[in-house]
Amino acid sequence: MYTRYSYNPSLGRTYVYDNKYYKNLGAVIKNANRKKHFIEHELEEKTLDPLDRYLVAEDPFLGPGKNQKLTLFKEIRNVKPDTMKLVVNWSGKEFLRETWTRFMEDSFPIVNDQEVMDVFLVINMRPTRPNRCYKFLAQHALRCDPEYVPHEVIRIVEPSYVGSNNEYRVSLAKRGGGCPVMNLHSEYTNSFEEFINRVIWENFYKPIVYVGTDSAEEEEILLEVSLVFKIKEFAPDAPLYNGPAY
C-alpha cells in the first residue's frame, strides 16, 4: 500500500502523441460538417442571385406607395381584467356612406388611375385616465366562416403586446396581394354597396380583432379604428398637343 510519501512507479509516467498524425475525432467530424454546410449554403445563395435586382421593404407599411387613412370611428370602451373586448365586427357603423364618400373624393382623384396595393387595419389605443401604468394587449383572426358570430368578450389566451406607440396594425391583403381595380373613384360612384363587397372584401380579409390590458383593474380606453390604404398611382395619360408652341 502506497502512502503519500512512498514511491509510486506510475507517477510521472506520460504518453506523448505526435499531433502531426493524431487529430481529435470530434474536430474532424465538425470540420467535415462545416465544409458540407458551406458548400450547400453557396449553392443556395447562387439560386437567389437573380433576386438582387429587386428591392423590398422590411415593413410593407413603410414600403413604396401612398398611405391614405380612413378613420372609421373613435370610441371609449371599458375593459375588465383578464378579458378582451371585440373592437371591429363590421356590423355597419364602419361603413357610413358620408365617411367613405368624403374619403373617396379626397383620396382618389377622378383623373388618376390608382390601384390598392394593401389595406391595413390600424387600431390606436390610449388610456383615458392619467397616471395609469399598464400595457395593451391585442389578438386577431383574419378569416372565419361567414355565418360565424364573434363573442363580444373573451378571456385572455396567448395575446400579443401592443408596441410602444400603442398602435396595433394588421395587413388585410390576401395571398398574391393587390386589388386589380383601376379608377377607384368611378367604381365607388357606380355603387357604394357593390364597391365594398366586390372591391374591398373580394380582395382583402375581414378581420376580427380583440383588445385588452394586463391591468388588474377595469380600465377605460379610447380606441381609434382606421383603415390605411396603400395606393399605387399611375400618371394620367397626357394628350398630345399640336400647335405653334410645340
UniProtKB/Swiss-Prot annotation:
This is Polyhedrin. It comes from Panolis flammea multiple nucleocapsid polyhedrosis virus (PfMNPV). The lineage of its organism: Viruses, Viruses incertae sedis, Naldaviricetes, Lefavirales, Baculoviridae. GO terms for cellular component: viral occlusion body. Pfam families: Polyhedrin. Signal peptide: none annotated. The gene is PH. InterPro entries: Polyhedrin. Keywords: Viral occlusion body. The keyword Acetylation does not apply. GO terms for molecular function: structural molecule activity.
